[in-house]
Amino acid sequence: MTGSVGSSMRSFALRILSAVLLSAMASTSFAQADIADAASKGNRAEIERLLKRGADVNAQQADGATALQWAAYRGDAGLAELLLKAGAKPGLANHDGATPLWLAAARGDAAVIRALLKGGADANEQLPLGRRPLMLAARSGNLDAVHALLDHGADVNASETERGTTALMQAADQGHAEVLMELIQHGANVAAASRPVMRDGRTAALGNSEDPRRAVRQQAIAVLCDAKTPDLREVRIQREMLFGASAKSTSDADLCKGIQRRGLGFVTVAGAGGNHGAGVGGEVTEDADGAAVADASGNPVPVGAGRGHRPPAREPDGGALTALVYAARSGSIDAARVLLEGGADVNQTTRYGWSPLLAATHNSNYQMARFLIEHGADVNLANKGGWTPLYLAVDNRNIEGGDYPVRTADMDSLTYITYLLDKGANVNWRITESTETRTVFTNQWLNEDGATAFLRAAQSGDLELLKLLVAHGADPKINTRLGVTPLAAAAGIGWVEGVTQERSPGETVETVKYLLSLGINPNFQADTGRVALHGAAHKGATEVVRVLVAAGARMDVRDFGNTDNRGSPTLAIHTWLPIDYADGLVRVGVQSAIPHPETSRVLRELMLKAGLKPPPEGRTLESLCIVDVCKPGYDPIGINN
């Protein structure tokens, strides 16, 4: 009995003690969380009450936020001073790495910044990605906040680690002229550049292959070898057509083995002489699985040869932006003026060759561009893509639905283009790379390499601009490097439905008439074999078709084949008439093959009138293959002729 009562009392006492401890723990935990909660609401009275009860002033919420961080975030300098006096740690960060000084600097809050610095915060503390408080304050534009940090020894030329930008670049990007002046007076380097980086590359395609006809033949070999049981005899036929008799001693089976292991990409368009990838006709090494692959003559490389070979590392070709480039990009003339007065070079370029003038033009900041020209900017300074202010201005005026948004210009585009021409812009300059507004859609069948501003204007049917360029000496007979004429571009070569900008269908017709009047040959074949009529037929521009045929355009001209028509090796190398494009049989790049019945009808009528036998209506790729082209040894390209 006694033992039972004693045991019961001990059990009761333990339950009471546990309840008291749990209550105390809950009370303490609540108080620790509550001080940051109170600060988040700006409840100073509650904070003072909690501090008197002994609450931990540095207690953190679930995300690491403290009361001092909330005071900085809310811009409450008085509360920040109270918390600092109570022992708040000014360098304590939340789980994202944000400190009270980081939050205050981002807001440009000079009063809170001073309170934190007085309380022991480090003006040069390292934030995530190497950012410094001065960079954030400079970006905010608050001059007093920048003063406060500089007065406490902030490094004016420190750079963050992600892109290598400095406080000067941050201020320039936001157009804060007064902050720029203050930073320069404290020794900011106006010539400093951000970190070099790699630019995004472009995928090679038939439109920019060095030899489109060989690219088509390579595609045929790839399709043959990709079959479950490759027809090695047909592979031999196609290889001899491509490489001649020199390929006779090679193993077709080994070649196909490499293609099967690597996929169709093993035989790439670039293998025909382009800059990307490798394959039949390109420099390659051993396959990852040990299969032999091909050398530059189409001969297999023995297993083990070239093991461990790696292409040389590419040097960064992007980045290295200066503060003046940032200012030009943002369009702040006041910021640019301060930087130039501080010694910035108006023609200093980025790693890819972007000058401040190019950056301003690319972003449609034409008032800024004019200001830079007035201060010595070279109007013909091109970047590594060969893009000049004139070409970019023409491109902006006729912008496509591209990969990059384009701002609304702050000056009439034709006024700016005229200004550039009057200042000596080279009207016949040829670019060397497709511009950034060129999408993967258009880049795959119209490469801008070698294009002039005139050709770019022609593509969009900008008749008014074409006449202006001619008046300033434009040569209408300069083609792209792969032989696309301004007439072909205007007619539809490179056209992508829903992407390519056109002034209007009517203006395009007038543009085609104008280009013909300048003496451009409508039957000039590009390296792909296409003529202007192929483009008009693919686009479904019926009236343009009529104009071209009336001007002597031939309807029996075949292209040199198309890597985008697959399904059989012979379809891959089949050559196509303009009527085939109108019938929706030819896919170009990622642009769908769209039938245009009205254009097809008109072309058939015109073919009959010219004594040509038009193909039957209602054709499909499947029916075409059955009755016409899918035969062993079929060679419409005549690559060795």
Predicted regions: what is each one?
Residues 46, 78-79, 111-112, 144-145, ...:
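Conserved ankyrin/ankyrin-like repeat signature
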